[in-house]
Structures are given as structure tokens and as C-alpha cells.
């Protein structure tokens, strides 16, 4: 690999090439949350639009882009460790470029290049669209380009995207967060919440469905707050905007499953629950972050709700959606957490009956109020409580899953999903409630089962973190997404919507069905 040159072909965009005249290859490595996964799809779309091609497996790419996370300390260590390993690779391949973006880049800024001088580009959460230009500038100037801006330049939706999946897609409803949780660094890195126009969101959903996608997940740091700060000044504040958006998704023909993440218990309202219950394609799944079952700790976290309020939400959801699967996030070892506080968390876990829980040991993040609290807990105390919580939650998970033995479930077949699938000869899929099911691909099958197809199976065995269905496939429905998966084709979405106060940029016309759905929201 040698230094790149830029070749301008007549009538074409500028294409990055190696000295040998080959188009440059890229790889995007993603750390962190679903937001980062979706941002990485935008990065891939940007790079391919600029002329790069995805690097084949088991090859050294000409460009490696890290989309980073800053929520936990081990994310920092993981990134800098990986960058250290790449130093020798880059020395052997002088034309190689390395770019670091995302939340950790937004946080560390110049520190990234100080710790890893062989990095070529550092960009933040607010200017991912600048990456191709920064890469060219770094190559031309033969020095690192660090560009971090303090506010969002444009919604990521005005950038092209190359999707990871042929059958399931992410769609952002907002960027940023207005909450001030004392443990969380995300608002300082992602900025204040700004909401997309409903019509733009639905246009993006329609564009995905038109390419075969059957499942969409609506993304936001706090989806319940959607509608409080539309970027379009012509749209009035609307606290029921999210429930209207869910109902509008129900009118899109061909969209079979809709999920969303993440809501906030303090702002979760009955109109959203009603929309979930009354809209057939909204999945009976809810991710509701608890963080702690102790009211004292919740107050210190600045979470704006208490355990009674949290449990009342779950009661209402289950009353209206009896088979809903509810998952959560829990932090163990927050500063000042006592044994009594921890027991309160265990009590809520036992009452809530979560299908699964993402449990974390508290990690102090510089720049957050909680990192400055004096009553930080010893590591061994946090570890011991974490292990006890895992035992309780795992037992709850298995008990809840046992209830499904003998039931028939519809699965959207997914790529991968089971580490032992090769050995067990099984495939994997997600039920409508989000549970992972490993199944035997035999029985009433219409040709080969592909990721993106739908099957129905009967649950024969339950484990804490997944279900098994070994009695054979009862029905198999082939899909356009399955056809696309079979040939390695994934959706691409063109720029949709408006920038922040900018003129409209390449927004496609909304399909008629989507236009009618939008009207009730706007």
C-alpha cells in the first residue's frame, strides 16, 4: 500500500486511489450504542459516495475509521489499545489512513493524536459529513487533521447511508438529549435534543421498506421527548408527537415490525402505550431503563422518577399489552449506594420480571457530576453486588422464558445470532417481542431459509438468554429482504430532509401512503 492520489474521472466524483491506480478500500469499526451503529452506516455511505469501496475480509484496508464510545472507561482503553496495535500495520503500509470519530473523539479532541500520533483524522459527533474532506486534507498536508465542532452542523439524515442489514433498519427521530443524569456524558457530547420532521422520518422508513426492509427501529436518546424541539420552526411543540409517529408507521404497507429505543421513565406516557397496543406492526417489546431501584440513588442520579412510578408504567404496559417483553438497563455501584439501596434494586428486579437486563458496573466519566462525588465505592464491593444481581436477573429471565415452552412464535430470520449454530445446525431469529430463538431449519421449508425470511416455530426449550425451537419449521415465508440477503445486497438511503436551518437537501418525494400518514402529525 502506497500513498494515495486523487483521480478525477470525466463526469464522475473525485475518486481516492492508491499510487497503483486502485480504488482505496475502507473499514468502519463501531464501538458503543445503536446510535453509533447507525452513524457508522452514514460513514460507510459517505465513503462509498466519495469513491471508496468496502475492504474484503482478511485484507488490510487503506482506511480504517473508528466510530467510538465514551460511556465507559473500558471503551477508552479498548480504542487506544487497538490504535497501538495498528501502529506497526501502518508502518508497513505507508499509504494507510486512520480516522477516529464519535463520542470519545468529541471528548478527547487533541488528546487522540497526542496518544496516537499515527492517527490521520479526528472528527466528532457533530461533523461526520466532513470525513472525506478531512481525509483528503490530511493526505495533502501530510499531517493530522483534528476538527471538532461544538454543535451539530446537519442532521445525519441529510447524508447518504449504506445499511448493514437487508431486512432491519435504524431510523433516527432525534439527536441529542435534554436530560442531565449525573452519571452520563452523552448530552455534553451529542448536544441538546433536536427533533426531525415527522415527514422526513416517514420518508426514510418508506425508502427502506421500498428496498425490502420489514423491520425498523426508531432511535433517539429519549424518544418520549420527541416533539418538544422540532428543528423545523414551522412545527409547533407537540408532546404527543411520538405516539402519532408510531401510529403513522402503522400505515406504511410492507412494514411488518416497528421497535423503538430508548424511552425515559419520567416522560413515558399512556398515549405511547395505547399506540403500541392499537397499532398492529408495533412490536410488543419495551426497553425501559431502570438504572437503580433505590429512590435515594435515583435522586442522586437526577433521574426524575422513583421506583413506584417505574413499576406503575410496567403495570400499565402489561395491562394493555399482556405479552409484552420488557428489558432494562441497571447500574450497580453508583457513588454512595448502600447495601440497602442495592437490595431495593434487587426488589424491583424481582417485581418487574424483566425479559433481559443490560447490567453495568458504575464507571466514573470525567466531566460528569457523579465522577466528583466523594463516596465512590471500592471495586470489590461493586463487583460482588454486580454478581449477585446477575444471579437474580438470570433466574428471572429463565423463569419468564420457561413460560413460552410450547408456544408458537413468528421469527424474522437473522444473519448469525448464535455462536454455536454451526455445531448445532441451527439458525436464529427474533420473535416479535425481541426474544432470540435458535431453531432447527427443517420441516415445511420453501427452498433455502435466508436472513430476512419469516418462519413460525414452536418453542421446545428455554435458557436464560434465548429460546430453542427444535420441532421443525411450521411455515416459511420468503421475502424480498431474503432475496437481497442471498446476494449480499443491502439498502442504501439517499439524503432525506433538511439541515439545521438550511434549505432542503435532496429530499425524495414521500410515497402517497406516507404523505397521508404524515398529515396527522404535522
From Swiss-Prot:
E.C. no: 2.8.4.3
Any GO molecular function: 4 iron, 4 sulfur cluster binding
Keywords: 4Fe-4S, Cytoplasm, Iron, Iron-sulfur, Metal-binding, S-adenosyl-L-methionine, Transferase, tRNA processing
Binding site for [4Fe-4S] cluster 1: 33, 69, 103
Residues covered by the TRAM domain: 402-473
Superkingdom of the source species: Bacteria
PROSITE patterns: MTTASE_N, MTTASE_RADICAL, RADICAL_SAM, TRAM
UniProt similarity note: Belongs to the methylthiotransferase family. MiaB subfamily.
Record text on subunit structure and interactions: Monomer.
Protein name: tRNA-2-methylthio-N(6)-dimethylallyladenosine synthase
Annotated source species: Corynebacterium glutamicum (strain ATCC 13032 / DSM 20300 / JCM 1318 / BCRC 11384 / CCUG 27702 / LMG 3730 / NBRC 12168 / NCIMB 10025 / NRRL B-2784 / 534)
Amino acid at each position: 500500500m502506497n500513498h494515495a492520489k486523487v483521480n478525477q474521472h470525466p463526469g464522475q466524483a473525485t475518486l481516492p486511489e492508491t499510487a497503483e491506480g486502485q480504488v482505496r478500500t475502507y473499514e468502519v469499526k463501531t464501538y458503543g450504542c445503536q446510535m453509533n451503529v447507525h452513524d457508522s452506516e452514514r460513514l460507510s455511505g459517505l465513503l462509498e459516495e466519495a469513491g471508496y469501496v468496502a475492504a474484503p475480509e482478511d485484507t488490510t484496508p487503506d482506511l480504517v475509521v473508528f466510530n467510538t464510545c465514551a460511556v465507559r472507561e473500558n471503551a477508552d482503553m479498548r480504542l487506544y489499545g487497538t490504535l497501538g496495535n495498528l501502529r506497526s500495520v501502518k508502518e508497513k503500509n505507508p499509504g494507510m489512513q486512520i480516522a477516529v470519530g464519535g463520542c470519545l473523539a468529541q471528548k478527547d479532541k487533541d488528546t487522540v493524536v497526542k496518544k496516537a500520533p499515527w492517527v490521520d483524522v479526528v472528527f466528532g459527533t457533530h461533523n461526520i459529513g466532513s470525513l472525506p474532506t478531512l481525509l483528503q486534507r490530511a493526505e495533502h498536508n501530510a499531517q493530522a487533521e483534528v476538527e471538532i465542532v461544538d454543535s451539530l452542523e446537519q442532521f445525519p439524515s441529510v447524508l447518504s447511508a449504506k445499511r448493514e442489514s437487508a431486512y432491519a433498519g435504524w431510523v433516527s427521530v432525534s439527536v441529542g438529549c435534554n436530560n442531565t443524569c449525573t452519571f452520563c456524558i452523552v448530552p455534553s457530547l451529542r448536544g441538546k435534543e433536536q427533533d426531525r420532521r415527522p415527514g422526513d422520518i416517514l420518508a426514510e422508513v418508506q425508502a427502506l421498506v421500498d428496498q425490502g426492509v420489514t423491520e425498523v427501529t426508531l432511535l433517539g436518546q429519549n424518544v418520549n421527548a420527541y416533539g418538544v424541539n422540532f428543528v423545523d420552526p414551522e412545527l409547533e411543540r407537540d408532546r404527543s408527537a411520538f405516539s402519532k409517529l408510531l401510529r403513522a408507521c402503522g400505515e406504511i404497507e410492507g412494514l411488518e415490525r416497528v421497535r423503538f429505543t430508548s424511552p425515559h421513565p419520567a416522560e413515558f406516557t399512556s398515549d405511547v402505550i395505547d399506540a403500541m397496543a392499537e397499532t398492529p406492526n408495533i412490536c410488543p417489546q419495551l426497553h425501559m431503563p431502570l438504572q437503580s431501584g433505590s429512590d435515594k440513588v435515583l435522586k442522586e442520579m437526577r433521574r426524575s422518577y422513583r421506583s413506584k412510578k417505574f413499576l406503575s408504567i410496567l403495570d400499565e404496559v402489561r395491562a394493555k399489552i399482556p405479552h409484552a417483553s420488557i428489558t432494562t438497563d441497571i447500574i450497580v455501584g453508583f457513588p454512595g449506594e448502600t447495601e440497602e439501596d442495592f437490595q431495593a434494586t434487587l426488589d424491583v428486579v424481582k417485581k418487574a420480571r424483566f425479559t433481559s437486563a443490560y447490567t453495568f458496573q458504575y464507571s466514573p466519566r470525567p466531566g460528569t457530576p457523579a465522577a466528583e462525588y466523594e463516596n465512590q465505592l471500592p471495586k470489590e464491593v461493586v463487583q460482588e453486588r454486580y454478581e449477585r444481581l446477575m444471579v437474580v436477573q438470570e433466574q428471572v429471565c429463565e423463569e419468564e422464558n420457561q413460560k413460552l415452552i410450547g408456544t408458537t412464535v413468528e421469527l424474522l430470520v437473522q444473519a448469525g445470532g448464535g455462536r454455536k449454530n454451526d455445531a448445532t445446525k441451527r439458525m436464529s431469529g427474533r420473535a416479535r417481542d425481541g426474544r432470540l430463538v435458535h431453531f432447527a431449519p427443517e420441516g415445511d421449508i420453501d427452498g433455502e431459509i435466508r436472513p430476512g425470511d419469516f418462519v413460525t416455530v414452536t418453542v421446545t426449550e428455554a435458557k436464560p438468554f434465548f429460546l430453542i425451537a427444535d420441532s421443525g419449521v411450521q411455515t416459511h415465508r420468503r421475502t424480498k429482504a431474503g432475496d437481497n440477503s442471498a446476494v449480499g445486497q443491502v439498502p442504501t438511503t439517499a439524503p432525506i430532509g433538511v439541515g439545521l436551518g438550511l434549505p432542503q437537501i435532496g429530499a425524495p418525494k414521500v410515497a402517497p401512503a406516507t404523505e397521508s400518514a404524515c398529515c396527522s402529525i404535522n
